[in-house]
């Protein structure tokens, strides 16, 4: 729920009669997808919107970080995700762009997913239960089991780890790429990988992500899975009657929040062949 000046509203009522904009260029998220030498590199970045209150455009830092990652991949496609992020971060730091962002990078081959995650973006592997390595999940009606790859990193509730720069303290108030969660997991043919900014996972439970994937697989596939997940996240973010994963976590932290969490949503989906 954004106005034309980029400011966000908590709910429809907060718009005071104004129409929310549909201009995707106002999103504070950034992403890229590059395939080099049979490896697919993907990154999603979530700019911190509160910079707008300080007169800083919160879109600039995540976009610069995303572009620097792409340039690094072009020069050194064999680097690991954490190495890519480290080089990109150093480049953006030299440019002294005010702002901050979470970051999630993946490198996916036919048999392996390598990741580097700093903050609260998320990545889930959706796997059919007859495939090796699938953990048992109870109470999930979907065909595929959601396997969480990287956990959130939070300083406090709703305060994720982030990379950034400020003209008052440089990079000191923020984390560095060395603070990121890194690792590798095996992937198998027909696995579906969903990576997204927190706008998805704050509003859509993992079980529901798997159910939407099921619906997509049994549909005519006119819409992409990423589009369907974005639509699901937006719908649930505007629902004041049903507590979202964000609202449930808020209440665990003694924060009174009900319903969904309006936010920018960026989703990238990959299917392993």
Residue map of PLM features:
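PP2C/PPM-type serine/threonine phosphatase catalytic domain
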Residues: 1-273
């Amino acid at each position: 729920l954004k106005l034309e000046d980029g400011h966000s509203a908590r709910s429809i009522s907060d718009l005071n009669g104004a129409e929310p904009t549909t201009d995707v260029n106002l999103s504070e998220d950034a992403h890229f997808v590059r395939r080099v030498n049979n490896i697919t590199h993907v990154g999603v970045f979530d700019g911190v919107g509160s910079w707008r209150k300080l007169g800083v455009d919160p879109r600039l830092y995540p976009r610069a970080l995303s572009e620097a990652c792409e340039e690094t991949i072009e020069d050194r496609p064999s680097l690991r995700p954490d190495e890519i992020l480290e080089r990109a971060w150093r480049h953006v730091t030299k440019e002294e762009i005010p702002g901050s962002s979470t970051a999630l990078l993946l490198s996916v081959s036919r048999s392996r997913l390598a990741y580097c995650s700093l903050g609260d973006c998320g990545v889930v592997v959706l796997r059919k239960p007859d495939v090796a390595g699938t953990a048992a999940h109870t109470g999930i009606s979907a065909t595929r089991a959601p396997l969480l790859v990287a956990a959130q990193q939070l300083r406090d509730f709703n305060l994720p780890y982030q990379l950034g720069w400020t003209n008052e303290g440089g990079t000191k108030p923020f984390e560095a790429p060395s603070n990121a969660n890194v690792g590798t997991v095996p992937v198998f043919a027909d696995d579906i990988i969903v990576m997204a900014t927190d706008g998805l996972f704050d509003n859509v439970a993992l079980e529901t992500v798997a159910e939407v994937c099921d619906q997509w697989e049994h549909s005519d596939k006119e819409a992409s899975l990423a589009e369907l997940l974005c639509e699901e996240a937006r719908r649930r973010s505007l629902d004041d009657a049903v507590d979202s994963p964000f609202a449930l976590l808020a209440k665990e932290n003694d924060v009174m929040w009900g319903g969904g969490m309006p936010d920018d949503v960026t989703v990238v989906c990959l299917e392993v062949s």
